């Protein structure tokens, strides 16, 4: 596996008008020195010369040429890069990333990081196929990486599949490692980049190649980002389901652990379903003894939780911190309302989760009162609970007003016993403990009664 040259920043596609001086070609120092000599932009350029032979690429500060590269002006690129022109140039530009820098008198300021790129990187990352082809035909070094990444890394990041195909046809190394330790396949991180991944695999990119520091395979990356098509492709190509990264996560752990908005829950479910159906272990623990179920509950993905439980995940295993899956969902319920955390709580309880100690229910109410249905499912799992005046004081007045019917019924539980219907439900659930979900279909109950037995939501307690 080849190693890219050292750098202090990644290749860039930032506008060339930032951080550049002058309108000529000249040597300069960025984070490394690129010695060489060159005449003005429009004139033929001599090859590198000097007593030591090859001294490295020239730095380009010609704004006219840079503009041609960044805008994909093929005619201008052809005019500048004639047969005698130097092609392997280095462009210094500012990235979009800020960093703190220290100046004299102990003052610190935020400045844009200086980054190095090349004409090949610029055209490949922007999808300028004809310009890229012209540079390659003029002899551009396809694996040059002054900024720590090759043009192939840049093309995969930008999901420019045609450019990836062209670079590979000119001998680009599909196993090239960036300075951060990633191969091009790791940079296929958008839904549009699946064709880039397919091209890399067909040209020999290792499907299980691990990054150097995080030790993540491409399947870890795809699973964490919820890329269903990438996961399908990698699994068909023989990706290792149980490969562990530096924190002990398998791809299934990585998918379950990734925070995501409610609208992305379906994509993460599809990813987890593919992994589980391919044989991923549902109780694989990371270094903190977090299982996929713990992590899915932290992210309140009810469909993933149901999938893992249906595949045999142990509902009561503890993490290194002593938390079960139920603890995890109760800790985030108030902040994940769009994810409908009450569905996760109900799923866990129906699969036999050990309930919260009754003496801690007041604390749970304070923390989860923004999700009344979470409280409903939890309270209905007990035959009776001791409700005191403190319960009414624990809920903000605006929430009581917003969910008046539910909270009034909750607070009234301290004044009267639970209904006979509820007590019968608790008795049946207790008798079927450990096999509730297997037994319910055999009971042939009416749908409404079946839902009641499985803690269906009514927004009222009785």
Regions found by a protein language model. Give the residues of each.
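Cullin-RING E3 adaptor/co-adaptor recruitment helices
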Residues: 2-36, 40-45, 56-57, 83, ...
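Ankyrin repeat start-site detector
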Residues: 60, 93, 115, 146-148, ...
């Amino acid at each position: 596996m080849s190693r890219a040259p050292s750098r202090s920043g990644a290749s860039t596609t930032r506008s060339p008008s930032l951080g550049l001086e002058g309108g000529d070609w000249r040597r300069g120092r960025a984070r490394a020195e690129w010695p060489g000599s060159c005449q003005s932009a429009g004139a033929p350029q001599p090859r590198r010369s000097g007593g030591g032979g090859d001294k490295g690429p020239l730095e380009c500060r010609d704004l006219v040429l840079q503009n041609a590269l960044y805008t994909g002006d093929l005619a201008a690129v052809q005019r500048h890069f004639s047969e005698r022109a130097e092609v392997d140039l280095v462009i210094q530009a500012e990235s979009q990333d800020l960093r703190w820098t220290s100046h004299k008198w102990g003052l610190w300021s935020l400045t844009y990081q200086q980054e190095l790129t090349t004409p090949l990187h610029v055209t490949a990352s922007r999808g300028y196929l004809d310009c890229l082809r012209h540079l390659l035909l003029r002899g551009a070094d396809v694996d040059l990486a002054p900024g720590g990444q090759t043009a192939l890394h840049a093309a995969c990041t930008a999901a420019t599949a045609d450019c990836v195909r062209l670079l590979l046809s000119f001998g680009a190394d599909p196993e090239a490692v960036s300075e951060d330790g990633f191969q091009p396949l790791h940079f296929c991180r958008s839904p549009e980049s699946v064709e880039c991944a397919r091209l890399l695999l067909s040209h020999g990119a290792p499907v299980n190649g691990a990054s150097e520091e995080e030790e993540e395979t491409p399947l870890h990356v795809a699973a964490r980002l919820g890329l269903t098509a990438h996961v399908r492709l990698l699994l068909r190509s023989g990706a290792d389901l149980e490969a562990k990264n530096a924190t002990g996560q398998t791809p299934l752990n990585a998918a379950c652990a990734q925070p995501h908005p409610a609208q992305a829950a379906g994509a993460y479910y599809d990813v987890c379903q593919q992994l589980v159906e391919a044989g991923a272990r549902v109780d694989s623990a990371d270094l903190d003894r977090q299982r996929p179920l713990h992590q899915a509950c932290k992210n309140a993905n009810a469909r993933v939780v149901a999938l893992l439980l249906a595949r045999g995940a142990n509902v009561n295993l503890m993490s290194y911190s002593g938390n079960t899956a139920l603890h995890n969902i109760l800790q985030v319920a108030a902040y994940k309302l769009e994810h409908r955390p009450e569905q996760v709580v109900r799923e866990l309880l129906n699969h036999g989760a050990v309930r919260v100690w009754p003496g801690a229910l007041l604390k749970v109410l304070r923390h989860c009162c923004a999700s009344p249905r979470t409280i409903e499912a939890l309270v209905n799992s007990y035959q009776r609970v001791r409700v005191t005046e403190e319960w009414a004081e624990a809920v903000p007045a605006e929430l009581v007003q917003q969910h008046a019917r539910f909270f009034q019924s909750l607070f009234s539980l301290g004044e009267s016993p639970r209904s006979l219907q509820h007590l019968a439900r608790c008795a049946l659930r207790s008798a079927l403990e450990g096999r509730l979900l297997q037994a319910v279909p055999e009971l042939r109950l009416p749908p409404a009664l079946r839902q009641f037995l499985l803690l269906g939501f009514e927004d009222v307690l009785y």
